[in-house]
Each structure stands twice: as C-alpha cells, then as structure tokens.
Amino acid sequence: MMPRIKPLLVLCAALLTVTPAASADVNSDMNQFFNKLGFASNTTQPGVWQGQAAGYAYGGSLYARTQVKNVQLISMTLPDINAGCGGIDAYLGSFSFINGEQLQRFVKQIMSNAAGYFFDLALQTTVPEIKTAKDFLQKMASDINSMNLSSCQAAQGIIGGLFPRTQVSQQKVCQDIAGESNIFADWAASRQGCTVGGKSDSVRDKASDKDKERVTKNINIMWNALSKNRMFDGNKELKEFVMTLTGSLVFGPNGEITPLSARTTDRSIIRAMMEGGTAKISHCNDSDKCLKVVADTPVTISRDNALKSQITKLLASIQNKAVSDTPLDDKEKGFISSTTIPVFKYLVDPQMLGVSNSMIYQLTDYIGYDILLQYIQELIQQARAMVATGNYDEAVIGHINDNMNDATRQIAAFQSQVQVQQDALLVVDRQMSYMRQQLSARMLSRYQNNYHFGGSTL
C-alpha cells in the first residue's frame, strides 16, 4: 500500500517569501503546506438528557478530511489505423530477398571456390580424421571472430557507463521507430541506418507520442516528469526547487549529457528554510524544456516566513489560547497533529502546575527540522511517482532512481544528526514526568485530607 501523502506539502508554505515575488513559487507552496497541516475536521460532543417522554443519549459525530494530492499514475495512448481516400496505413512487417544478379554472383563465387571444395572432398574420402580436425579448427576461428563483435557490444552496454548504454539503447529506439513507420526496407537496412548510416537523428525526430520520452535528445528528464503533475502547473520555481533536491539528467541536441547531482541536504538551502536568508538552486533559462540550467541562482526567504519564526508564533498563539480557554483554529490543530512531539502537552502541563513553560521553546529547532524533512520527503515522493509513470530509457531511469535514492539517504543521514537534539526532548520529558508526579501527589494528599475532614464532621 502506498504511504499516505501527508498534508505537509503545504506547510513550509507559511515559511518562504521568495524574491522576486511571484504568484507561484517555493514560498507559496510552503505556505500552503504549513497552513493545511493535519486534518480539516468538525466534531460534536456526546450527550445524555432526560425529556418529558423519555431519556436520550447520543454519541456525537466526527468529520475529518486530509489534503488530497493528484498524481497521474497511468498515461495511455490507444492504437489507431489510418484509412482514407488514398488507402489504408498499416505496418505488417517486411522481408528481403536476393535477385537474379545476386544469385549469379553467388554461383560464380561458389565455382571460384571449387578447388577448396574438391580438396575438402578428397580429405573426406581418403583421410576423414584430418578433415574433421580441419573443420573443428575452422569452426573455432569463426566462433572467436563472432564473439569479438558481441563482446564489444556487451562491454558498451554493461561497463561503458551511462553514455554507451544510452547510445546502445538509442539504436534500439531508432530501429523500433523505423519499424513502426516503415522507414527502411528491412531489419538489416534499419540496423545500418540507425548505426553507421547516420539516419538516427532524422528517424528519432519522427517518434510518436508514446516513444518521445524514450528519445534521449533535447530533454531534461526530471523537468519533463514534473511537468506532467498538475501540482506544479504555473510554478516554475517549485519545479526548479524539486529538481535541485533530486538532481536530473539533461540531454542536448546531439545526445550530450549534463548530469545534475542531488543537493537534498545543501546547508544553505536548509538554513534558509529554517532561519531565513538566501539559498542557491538550479534555475532554467527556458521554462518549456529546461535544457539550459544555471546551477547557482539565489532564492531569498525572509526571516519572518522561515520555519523557526512561524513555529515560534504558533507556539505562542497555542499557549495564549490554552490560558484563555479559547478554541484552536485549523492551522494550529494541524500543526499539533503533524509533528511527532507532544507540543500541546508540553504547553498545557506547565500551566496546570503553575511553572514556566519556556522549555518547549528550546525544541523549536527540533520541531522545525521534523516538519521540514517531511516536506522535502513528500516533494521527492512526488518526483519519484512522476518518473515511474514515464516511458523513459531504462538506463536513464536507473540513473535518476540512483539520484533519488541518494537524496533519500542524505535525508536519513541528516535526520540522524537531528536526532542528537532528542537529548533536549528527553530532558523535557523527564522534567514533565517529575512535575506530573508532584501534581498527582499533591492532588491525592488534598483529596485524602478533604475525605478525612468530611468524615470527621459526620
């Protein structure tokens, strides 16, 4: 079962203000993510009452909705047959045959080799053992020569790196397209044209919609995949941000490869999202295909909209409402339900004990990293889902998946560093546990005193 996509892609929304301002950018997505944390819910309390005719009891009700993200999991193109006044277009395969002139040349060649044949015939008749040994040696030489070709091709496809692998696969793509479009006379002609014949580019330019993603020419793989998700419609900067996190492969007009490595835990990006400031992300000079990528384009996040500031404001608001017994709004409820830290308990318990609750503010960094890593993980999940729906070359998908796996490992490593801050959380837990025990002991003592006092007056 696929993991539930938490409504977190919206949080870090209240977090980022990017310069220059834009209607759709990383800032707006993080604000949406932050504002829609948790569930949209509505509840009614259970109750019991006695009427004139009867007694009544009802259990209350619960309504909860979480944010929905649309992911296009399957894309299908149906086959078709074109028929019109000019005829019917259908590809039924092809075959080749030799003509009379070729047959005559072949017979002449056989006759020119007649001396060798007569020699073999004489050996077979007089000394068959020698004939058998000669045939064995000839077969061995032929097998070795044929293996030279196949081993060369295998070396390209197995150990030659990404470029040879894509080169071999593109020859196959070219031949597939040529076969579907009936461009060459037969298989041998298509192999010739798609390799040394120089027809590969012109053939691949005729790729149908279902084959275009297989052609590694003039394509940015991650950009192409993200463009199929409506979540990124009109949000060029968010796509650039995701591409920076996951990395990509950019194929130029001649198949040249420009790799973009994953920068998931780039310190400048993490710091800017947590505390505000400037981070550098990959930027596309063209928003259509993103073939020209500038590696270090600055994106500015204001301090007020960074995660730490937003979380501090929310904690203060929740604390004040707890003191005044005011209901929490949806944003505050979502914030409490989205983090693994029992925030509400750490705010309310000290109020009940009459002590300072400043301890919770010591955990602002930890809470911020907890939410930020959820946001980044969900963006990577979106990217992984869209790559999986594409018809990309196997070698390309392998490289992209390696990039995203590397990004996931970077997040895990970063999380292990953040876990160090759990020491502070454990200290808070111990302090809160001790205070609750004290309160419980005081309440029990007061209850017992009241009980004995009440008993003595009877």
Swiss-Prot record:
Annotated signal peptide: 1-24
Highest taxon, organism lineage: Bacteria
Keywords: Conjugation, Periplasm, Plasmid, Signal
GO cellular component, one term: periplasmic space
Cellular location(s): Periplasm
Regions annotated as coiled coil: none
Keyword set includes Signal: yes
Pfam families: TraH
Keyword Protease in record: no
Functional summary from the UniProt entry: Involved in pilus assembly.
NCBIfam families: PRK13723.1
Name used for this protein in its record: Protein TraH
